[in-house]
A protein has these predicted regions:
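N-terminal secretory signal peptides that target proteins for export/translocation
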Residues: 1-10
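Bacterial N-terminal signal peptides
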Residues: 14-27
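Signal peptide processing junction and immediate N-terminal pro/mature segment
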Residues: 24-40
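Electrostatic cytochrome c docking/interface patches
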Residues: 35-63
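Gly/Gly-Pro-rich "capping" loops immediately C-terminal to redox-active cysteine motifs
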Residues: 51, 57, 75-111
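The canonical Cys-X-X-Cys-His
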Residues: 60, 64-75, 126, 130
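Flexible coil segments in periplasmic/lumen-exposed cytochrome c-class electron-transfer proteins
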Residues: 115-160
Length: 160
């Protein structure tokens, strides 16, 4: 006999409610947050998700040839003064990092004689060109030059 005979029905209802609610709680815990802000999300996309447009890559190619090819060469192979921007060494050095890191590196260190003179949009367009040149697929939407947007895109060398 229960020490609380009057509350037997309440205990049974509570136990039944807990059993029914447990899968719901587990599902909520496993699901991504519904109100996640851009600053809280990380790396939801990769360079294989068509994160730039062909038109943007075209602008980036023009900018690259005007501002970068002098040191990095038109073939992006690099030279005595500058590293390569294509090939296995380039790809492996950026693999797993965010496009925000690549953007920041270019924006703050290029050109080496006067770093920081290129606009964020110029750098983003050049990144679109680098991605296109290295075989990543273009899409319908341009790569956005905001840090939050770039922070959510990982440079991944192997296709999914």
């Amino acid at each position: 006999m229960s020490p609380f005979p009057r509350h037997r029905g309440l205990r049974a209802a509570g136990l039944l409610g807990a059993i029914i609610a447990m899968p719901l709680w587990a599902g909520l815990a496993a699901a991504p947050a519904m109100h996640t802000t851009a600053g809280e999300r990380h790396n939801d996309r990769t360079t294989w998700d068509s994160v730039f447009s062909a038109a943007q890559a075209g602008r980036g190619e023009t900018t690259y040839k005007q501002l970068c090819a002098r040191c990095h060469m038109e073939t992006l192979a690099g030279g005595d003064e500058a590293g390569e921007l294509t090939g296995s060494a380039f790809m492996s050095s950026w693999n797993g990092q965010t496009l925000a890191a690549l953007h920041e590196r270019i924006r703050t260190s290029m050109p080496t004689d006067t770093p920081g003179v290129y606009s964020s949009q110029q750098v983003t367009d050049v990144i679109a060109y680098l991605l296109h040149f290295n075989g990543f697929p273009p899409g319908a939407v341009e790569l956005t030059h905001t840090n939050d947007a770039l922070q959510n895109i990982r440079f991944v060398t192997t296709p999914p």
